[in-house]
Amino acid sequence: MDERALSRAWTDDVADDAREAALQRLVAAAHARWPAAWLAPTTFVAELALRRSDGEREAAALRRMTDHAAELYLAVACQHGVDAAVRAFDAEYLGEVPRLLRRLPEGEGLADDAAQAVRERLLVGDAQRGPRIAEYAGHGGLAGWVRVTVVRGRAQPPAGTHGGARARRRRARARGRG
């Protein structure tokens, strides 16, 4: 995104100097939390502009994003394939996914395979849709967003994978008992 497009994306109800100061604070807070997951500030700011809700005033968006600056930064860095960000996301947010999946009615036997499918859906995407992490907009914490994404997805594996080798073996055993 060029500088003019970036400027237009953020121009509505905040003075230029206030906007610049707010964006600098966002970038500084994010870099402080995830120093190894380096992302160009212009890339981060451009992605923040894309995460404004339809009709959301700039001042409100900046306040919301300030509350979740570090989480937004991590999500954007993951979306852009920054290895340190992906490792941090795995450690900080995906560790609880298998436990969460085991609590779902259909998740007890499929937790490990489903957790890998969730990771792929969040960080890689598929042919029809890019990585879901790109949809995180800072309306609440990233951990909560991950939990909601897991539960709404009901831990279904991506199309065409059928849950991996373990799931295929379980289905084969179930058919044999049928």
Predicted stretch roles:
Residues 1-178:
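Intrinsic, short, N-terminal disordered tails of RNA polymerase sigma-factor systems
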